[in-house]
Amino acid sequence: MAHRLIYQVVVTGTQVFAKAFTQAYKQAATAQAASKTSKSAASKFGGLQLDEACKILDVDETALDKVVAELNKKHKLEDIAESESVLAQIDKKFTHLYTVNSEHKSGSFYLQSKVYRAMERIRGELELDPLPKPEIEEPKKKEEEKK
């Protein structure tokens, strides 16, 4: 009788351990697959994650997700108008940060590159056209001012 009880305890313990092990393995496999896809997307867009790009351009990530959803639906006109206003705000922030950090205004090329890559990442997420570099007014040279 005692050997039957010990046998049941061992079998039940083995079953519980096996189920826990398989669940942990499945979770680890899905987490690894998800990290590979996010890393490949980040490497495609200059090494930036989407949340990092949103922080650089000071964009609310939930608003960006809403824009992505609306661009995928394209049903209601007011939603499209709202999405376009969010895109216009993002573009305005980009052009401001890009021009402020230009080398002609004693800005940082590194920061300018970060801003450009952040916008490139957001446009890639929204599947928009490639990003053209904004034109920056070059300061007049001293020779031209003397004339």
UniProtKB/Swiss-Prot annotation:
Residues 52-127 are annotated as: J-like. Keywords: Membrane, Mitochondrion, Mitochondrion inner membrane, Protein transport, Translocation, Transport. Its main location: mitochondrion. It is a peripheral membrane protein. Signal peptide: none annotated. InterPro entries: J_dom_sf, Tim16. The keyword Glycoprotein does not apply. It comes from the Eukaryota. The keyword Acetylation does not apply. One of its GO terms (biological process) is protein import into mitochondrial matrix. Essential component of the PAM complex, a complex required for the translocation of transit peptide-containing proteins from the inner membrane into the mitochondrial matrix in an ATP-dependent manner. In the complex, it is required to regulate activity of mtHSP70 (SSC1) via its interaction with PAM18/TIM14. May act by positioning PAM18/TIM14 in juxtaposition to mtHSP70 at the translocon to maximize ATPase stimulation. Heterodimer with PAM18. Component of the PAM complex, at least composed of mtHsp70, MGE1, TIM44, PAM16, PAM17 and PAM18. Belongs to the TIM16/PAM16 family. This is Mitochondrial import inner membrane translocase subunit TIM16. It comes from Yarrowia lipolytica (strain CLIB 122 / E 150).
